[in-house]
UniProtKB/Swiss-Prot annotation:
PROSITE patterns: RIBOSOMAL_L6_1. GO terms for biological process: cytoplasmic translation. The gene is rplF. Disulfide bonds: none annotated. This is Large ribosomal subunit protein uL6.
Length: 179
């Protein structure tokens, strides 16, 4: 049995849960999320918490037990508090701006890089170089942050590029002149 899967998911006050078969819908102050469970997992609400039950004894079901418990917990946290990722843009002349539902970045290329912001995600820009990505779906927030970082991954010589806040880039010395 999964140690993570057995743990109950505490429901904060103000979270509405509706369970219809294997479909779980969570609604909170930040929004609404939907999660579909596999056939071998059952969920029920008890004493202000959600409890997952594994009805099969296969290796796959044991592996999925903890995964879906974590995904449901992330959904509960998302509709209650939301998630955010912070990115920093380093480089001379590198900047970003939000124009409607598009993020426009100047990253030293001959053209501006335009990224379409998906539904359910908000992007804020501070000082033209600090991005804050917010949303209720943890997977989507992380995927958007990774997509934006992928436009210019930090290079090890000068440290130019887009990186997560607090991320340490290992620097290299570069070539040394020989005489």
């Amino acid at each position: 049995m999964s140690r993570i899967g057995k743990l109950p998911i505490k429901l904060p006050p103000g979270i509405k849960v509706s369970i219809e078969g294997n479909n779980v819908t969570l609604e909170g102050k930040k929004g609404k999320l939907f999660h579909r469970l596999p056939e071998f997992l059952k969920v029920h609400q008890q004493d202000g918490s959600l409890i997952l039950e594994n009805t099969a004894d296969s290796r796959q079901s044991k592996a999925m037990y903890g995964l879906h418990r974590s995904l449901l917990n992330n959904a509960v946290m998302g509709v209650h508090e939301g998630f955010q990722k912070k990115l920093e843009i380093n480089g001379i002349g590198f900047r970003a701006a939000v124009e409607g539902k598009k993020l426009v970045m100047n990253l030293g290329f001959s053209h501006p890089v335009v990224y379409e912001i998906p539904e359910g995600i908000s992007v804020k820009v501070q000082d033209n170089t600090k991005l804050t990505i917010e949303g209720i779906d943890k997977c989507l927030v992380g995927a958007v942050a990774a997509d934006i970082r992928g436009f210019y991954v930090p290079e090890p010589y000068k440290g130019k590029g887009i990186r997560y806040a607090g991320e340490v880039i290992r620097r290299k010395a570069g070539k040394t002149a020989q005489k």
